[in-house]
Amino acid sequence: LTSSAAVVAASTFSLAEAQSGRTPAAGPFAVRAGEGRPGGQWLVHGEKVFTTKVSGADVGKTFAIIEVHTPPGLGPELHVHPAQNELIFVLKGSIGLQCGSDRTILRAGDAFMAPLNVPHAYVTLGTEPAHMLHLFNPAGDMEGFFADYAPLVSVDGEPDHQKLAEVSEKHGVKVVGPPLMASSFAS
């Protein structure tokens, strides 16, 4: 984690811990670059795209941090998390982001928090993949979501959007619209 992301993660846990009285399930640990927590790496077209850096199981389900690499021109469908906030911290590249009716461009070093129940989506801009950390608070079942989601988007051609919506719903994510188009963001 970058120092900024580590501070965000530590702050979020401290706040959640204070509010809930829960304590972490795991002791201190380090997760090296290119590695993830056990069972927490998912491939799309043979590339490591989703990597769990901090599992909800590690911290009493108070939060989870997933490292995400998204190719140019791609991103998730417009969706809501009915029971979670999602913080996106851009490490490399740039994304066009919509949250509610607000639209903005985030670049390396920028962060954005999408509150629970607010529709949001992003699309990678430019010619390079976006490299991000997504922090979910509370953790919910986001690791289960990514485990089920990765094989569905790892197909040649267009993925089955009905199946993506079903997997999303199963894991507490509600799809409410199509993915964003990179062309709709002026760089």
Question: Would you name each region that the model predicts?
Answer:
Residues 19-27:
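Cleaved targeting-peptide boundary
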Residues 116-143:
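Ligand-binding loop in jelly-roll beta-barrel domains
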Residues 148-187:
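Acidic/histidine-enriched, glycine/proline-rich intrinsically disordered or flexible terminal extensions
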Residues 67-71, 80-97, 135-137:
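Short, conserved beta-strand element in jelly-roll/cupin
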Residues 39-78, 84:
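A short glycine-rich, His/Asp/Glu-containing loop-to-beta-strand
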